[in-house]
Amino acid sequence: MSKIDVSIVIPTKNAGPLLDRVLQAVFEQKTEYVYEVICVDSGSKDETLDIIRKYPCRLFQIPPEEFGHGKTRNYGAAQGTGTFIVFITQDALPAADTWLQNFID
């Protein structure tokens, strides 16, 4: 397995269909970096988990009462194996397909 350069952490809860577009854009990044996507879900009741499972994400589920903006991000970062950690929200569409490359450079 290749060394992971970047861990992208996305906290989720009831993200809805926009998450599908976000994940598609993340996985279409043009970059020299090897990256993983970590989704930390805190009790979604909609289609969020099904959407995440369509992609090669690492999914971690936590109880809703364990959610905290910083705490959840820290948990996701701790699961990552990348040299760099990047956080995005469940509704943040990357601005371009070179977003990750530009961000890390």
Indicate residue ranges for each PLM-predicted region.
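A conserved acidic beta->alpha catalytic loop
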Residues: 41-49, 93
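Acidic helix N-cap motif at the loop->helix transition within catalytic regions
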Residues: 17-20, 46-53
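Conserved donor NDP-sugar-binding/catalytic core segment of glycosyltransferases
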Residues: 93, 98-105
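Short aromatic/hydrophobic "clamp" motif used to bind/position activated sugar donors
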Residues: 85
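Short beta-strand/loop segment that forms part of the nucleotide-sugar
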Residues: 34-43, 62
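Glycine-rich, basic loop-to-helix element that forms the pyrophosphate-binding segment
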Residues: 62-80
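Catalytic metal- and UDP-sugar-binding loop of GT-A-like glycosyltransferases, i.e.
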Residues: 62, 88-90
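N-proximal low-complexity "stem/linker" segments adjacent to membrane-targeting elements
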Residues: 1-27
